[in-house]
Amino acid sequence: MLNYDCDVCVAGNGPSGMIAARQLALAGLSVIIIGSPNHQMHKFGETLAGAAIRLLLKLGLKELVETLLNTSNDNNSFPPKVTGNMAFWGTEQASITDAIHDPYGLGLRIDRQRFDTLLKQYIQLKNITHLNANITNLTKQNGLWKITLDGKMLITSKWIIDATGRSAKILKLLGVQRYRGAPLVALYRTCVPEKNISLNKTIISSNESGWLYAGKISEEKWVLGFHTLPKFAFNLRNHASHWDDIINKKSGITDLLGQLGLSADIYAHDVRTTWSPENSGEGWVACGDALLAFDPIAGQGLFNAIYTAIKASEHILSAEQKITLESNYLKEFQKIIKVYEHRRYSLYKEEQRWLDSAFWKVHQYYQ
């Protein structure tokens, strides 16, 4: 069995795990990042909000941001900037928000797989080791974690970070309970609009059974996502013809984009709100979606990944250096949860047209 020793073991090699690892490595700690060899979730284009871009710049990742700004998705030359939102929510009339009024600036529509690859390139430091394996056992002996990988490798580490995304593998191994919000499934597929293909705004549109998301991801393609309850998602995925009903039911999308040439492939993801009441303990800390996974309506996925990674690394460094932080990680996290849940509830409550709908009954309940 191969043996490794490090100060911090980061489980998960998504944006949150990589940012946390970089911050700790820059502070002089030895870090091992464990990626899952079987992780194959399809990642469509995603919006990197202006606030998230500001965090990356604050971390000194200016070159990464410039690379994203100056090159395109899928080798196509189109401006990746997102100029705002158009929402058909609570009414058939569009509510338009221009990103120019956002104090953090314009967002970027990024290829998530490419973003993750670029981020990995920009965090290459000599005291970061990358491994791809499954964590099969986790124990603690004499204040140190013993982390077994595929029964073939053993890592001894003082700290472990759960950055495994919604699966929260480390929290589960530790027996930490997680809150699960109202059921929500997202079905994603690409499409080619008939008109206004160059529109650089995100479109959100509610209907009786859920809500639609549409955004440009390349010179010719858009991504279309429908967020609904599991039973409706199952029927929609297995009867693709029903998409026409979803799109054409006064969604505003047909008026804007014309007829959509829909791809055959449909990808389903569980995107309900999940969070852990505990974000850290003796020798462990969680960040990213493992800690708090937002409902996509919040549009804060990548910001949350980066921000909580920074806070998780600060938590470890303060413990190692015996420094008292200005803000307590747990208290700050609890405040974020409270604000998020209130805003989410308020947003869903704005839709008053389908009060008897199963979807809106579930999501307008304040838990």
Enumerate the language-model features and the residues they cover.
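Glycine-rich FAD pyrophosphate-binding loop
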Residues: 9-13, 25-46
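C-terminal helical "tail/cap" subdomain of flavin- and related membrane-associated enzymes
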Residues: 314-367
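A conserved beta-strand/loop capping segment in the N-terminal third of enzymes
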Residues: 58-115
